[in-house]
Structures are given as C-alpha cells and as structure tokens.
C-alpha cells in the first residue's frame, strides 16, 4: 500500500503546478519605453498584481520595433508563469500584415492568452480652421477637396494610420496620409494647422478639445469614452459599425499550465472591476474589456483577420 501511494504521489503533485503560484517575483515585459502610456498602464497592472498575489510583479521595459522584439523574446521563454507580456495591437493583431515573413513568432500559436484588459480608443480631431463642426459636415467638405486635405498619424502602420484609412473607406473621402515619428510631432503639426485632421489618443486629444485648440468629430470605438463624454462615436455620427482601437492584454509563453492561467485571469478580472482602478482607467481615456482566456484568443484571431482585410482593402504599404 505504501508503495502504491508513493507511486501516485508524483502524479498528484505534477497535476497542480500552479497550486502555490507565485512563489517568487514575476517579470512583466513591456515593449514600450519608460514614461509612456503603455508603460504607465503596465505598472498599474503590476502594482495591482503585487498587492493581490503576495509576490512582486516587476515591469521590465524592452522597447523597439513596435514591441515585436520583446514579444519574440517572451515567446521563447519558459512557460512557468514567471514571465508575462503586455501585448497590444501593434505586436499581435496587425503585426503579421506589417512585418510579414520577418515576424519571428505567431501571435496566435506561440502565446497563452490570459486576459484582454482594455481598449485604447482614438478621437478624430481637427484644426479649428477646418470649416466643419460635425463629422457629416467634414465628410461633405472633404468630398469637395479630394486628396487636398491631409491627416497626420503616429507612423506608418500605427493604429492612428489604420483608423484614418478605415475612415477614408467608410466615408468615401480621400484625405492624404502624412506619417510622423510618434504622437508628439503629429499633434504639433495639427495644432499649427499644417495638417487638417488626425486620429489621436483620447488622453492626448482631450486636453486640446477642452481648451478649444482642436475640435472633435467623434471617438473611434462603439462605446463613448468618459474622458470625452461630449464626443459621440463615429458609429453614432453616421459611420455604422466603425470600431478601430488598439488594445492591451496580458499573455505568456505558450503552454502555460492551466492553474496558473486561471489564477492570473481571476486576479486580472478583479483588476477590471476594482473601483479605484476604474477611476484611473477613465482618467487615462481607456475602456475596460476584461475578456478571459478563451474570449481573448478568439478576439486575437478575429481582429487579426479584420485588420488584414482593412490593410488589403486600403492598399496600405508598410515599407
């Protein structure tokens, strides 16, 4: 009997690899530089998990190539729960279209998808000199000036670029792309009137809307955003189904044991419902999602296909 019990003991222990997880500090890899919005959000998540799970969750910044360098490194790490990654649209759902065969990982196959935490809405803003107050007025105005108006983006292949091309397709206008190296120079030229419109992050655009330096035509998600609650959605304003946003979620290397996945998913679900956290997310112009592992995996598959179609339909070139 003792031999029988001893023979079964290892199997019982092996069946519960996440029973006491975590037993040491956990790294949360962030593919953004320190101080940016992605880094701020990552630290908010890490601090919450540290408080809730009894071990330190430490943010490690590894910026470069829209996060794909960091994502590739994480994909090759042990699936033991001690390395997590803050995934986003740029390194997951638009990465294959933008990087093609150069992408060194498969966003669907090479990761365990734990929780889709938030959507990052954009707001369509215009310089005050544009003679249009509403979205429909702007569309009518732009149709009288095909290829004569310009829109700024954060860079070629960025979500602000994709949103504007989706807008061109949905509205039938032809506004010309001017790519910048990041948000700051793009916003600076918009404020100076060198370009007419852009899809900016809600956090950035809200202060210029409230100061009257820019005007809003609407937000890019199907839900209104509390930080700019006076701005309608583009869907409400006459572009049915318009829904373009980046997103942020937590993933790990493929093969993460189910108990660890479940433990993290439960705590991250609590994160998206915590009243203090929700106030901070509202202040950052974010929309809570909270989809768990199965729904997150489905989202990545479907959103990748949707973005691939948009990129093809708009003939967007990344090189």
Named regions from a protein language model:
Residues 76-82, 97-185, 234, 245-280:
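Hinge/capping helix and adjacent helix->loop/strand transition within the periplasmic-binding protein
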Residues 1-15:
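N-terminal export signals
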Residues 23-25, 170-173, 210, 236, ...:
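An extracytoplasmic/periplasmic, membrane-proximal ligand-sensing/linker region
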Residues 37, 41, 45, 49, ...:
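Stable alpha-helical elements in mature extracytoplasmic
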Residues 14-109, 147-148, 156, 172-197, ...:
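N-terminal (or domain-start) structured segment
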Residues 32, 48, 52, 77, ...:
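Structured segments of extracytoplasmic/periplasmic soluble domains
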Residues 91-100, 161, 166-170, 197-231:
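A ligand-binding cleft/hinge motif common to bilobed small-molecule-binding domains
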């Amino acid at each position: 009997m003792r031999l029988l019990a001893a023979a079964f003991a290892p199997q019982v222990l092996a069946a519960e690899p996440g029973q006491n997880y975590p037993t040491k500090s956990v790294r949360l890899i962030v593919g953004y530089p320190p101080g940016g919005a992605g880094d701020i959000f990552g630290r908010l998540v890490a601090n919450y998990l540290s408080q809730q799970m009894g071990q330190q969750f430490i943010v490690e910044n590894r910026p470069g190539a829209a996060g794909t360098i960091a994502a590739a490194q994480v994909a090759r790490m042990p699936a033991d729960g001690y390395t997590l990654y803050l995934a986003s649209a740029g390194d997951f759902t638009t990465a294959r279209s933008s990087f093609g065969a150069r992408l060194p990982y498969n966003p669907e196959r090479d990761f365990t998808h734990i929780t889709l935490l938030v959507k990052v809405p954009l707001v369509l803003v215009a310089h005050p000199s544009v003679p249009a107050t509403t979205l429909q007025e702007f569309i009518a105005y732009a149709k009288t000036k095909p290829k004569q108006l310009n829109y700024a983006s954060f860079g070629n292949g960025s979500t602000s670029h994709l949103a504007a091309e989706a807008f061109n397709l949905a509205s039938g206008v032809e506004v010309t792309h001017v790519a910048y190296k990041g948000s700051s120079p793009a916003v600076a030229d918009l404020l100076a009137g060198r370009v007419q419109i852009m899809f900016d992050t809600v956090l950035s655009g809200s202060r210029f809307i409230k100061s009257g330096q820019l005007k809003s035509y609407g937000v890019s998600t199907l839900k209104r955003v509390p930080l700019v609650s006076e701005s309608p959605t583009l869907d409400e304003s006459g572009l049915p189904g318009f829904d373009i946003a980046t997103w942020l979620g937590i993933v790990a290397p493929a093969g993460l044991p189910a108990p660890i996945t479940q433990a993290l998913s439960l705590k991250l679900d609590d994160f998206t419902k915590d009243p203090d956290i929700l106030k901070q997310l509202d202040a950052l112009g974010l929309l809570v999602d909270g989809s768990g592992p199965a729904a997150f995996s489905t989202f990545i598959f479907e959103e990748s296909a949707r973005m691939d179609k948009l990129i093809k339909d708009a003939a967007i070139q990344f090189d």
